[in-house]
């Protein structure tokens, strides 16, 4: 039986980021070549049905997969200039519509938070975190992080996904330009376990 945590939650985003970096390294041209990352999404299970055979009912783990992809796109924004999510409504989508009713899936919330909070310049960040190893990947940091800075608002946004399915991780946030002495706001997507 497949281990969903290892094969999808950890491996798929790590592989995607590795492929983006490999594409950048293989470009030995004097011109920049950019990537459009098309039709990405969390799609881990398929439910049978009469109408929507490709429909997904997402859980917290899927929302965290979406957040990891958004972190990847911020970290690699020098090369990934466009990233199109596969499907936005109903089939493998963050929103579902049934007649005149709309409901938001778990994968909607990371999209909402990134779209409404991440502005300005993506920051190059350094992460020191406990790590996880799979058969294919060694030393995958449990903390998956991206950050942005909006100079006009003097605002730093830090996006963190804890990949550890069993433990909370305490982290220190340090800045090379001084301490953070302003008000901070936290938006948290969380649950008792990832399969909710």
How should these model regions be labeled?
Residues 1-69, 127-139:
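Noncatalytic carbohydrate-binding groove/subsite architecture in carbohydrate-active enzymes
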């Amino acid at each position: 039986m497949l281990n969903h945590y290892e094969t999808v939650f950890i491996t798929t985003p790590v592989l995607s980021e590795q492929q983006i970096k490999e594409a950048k390294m293989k470009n030995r041209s004097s011109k920049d070549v950019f990537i459009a990352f098309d039709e990405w999404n969390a799609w881990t299970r398929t439910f049978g049905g009469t109408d929507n055979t490709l429909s997904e009912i997402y859980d917290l783990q899927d929302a965290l997969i979406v957040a990891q992809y958004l972190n990847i796109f911020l970290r690699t924004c020098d090369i990934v200039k466009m990233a199109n999510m596969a499907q936005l409504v109903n089939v493998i989508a963050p929103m579902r519509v049934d007649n005149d009713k709309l409901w938001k899936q778990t994968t909607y919330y990371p999209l909402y938070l990134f779209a409404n909070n991440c502005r300005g310049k993506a920051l190059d960040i350094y992460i020191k975190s406990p790590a996880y190893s799979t058969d294919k990947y060694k030393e995958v940091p449990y903390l998956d992080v991206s950050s942005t800075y909006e100079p006009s608002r003097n605002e730093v946004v830090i996006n963190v996904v804890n990949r550890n399915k069993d433990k909370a991780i305490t982290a220190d946030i340090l800045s090379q330009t001084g301490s953070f002495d302003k008000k901070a706001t936290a938006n948290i997507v969380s649950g008792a376990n990832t399969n909710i």
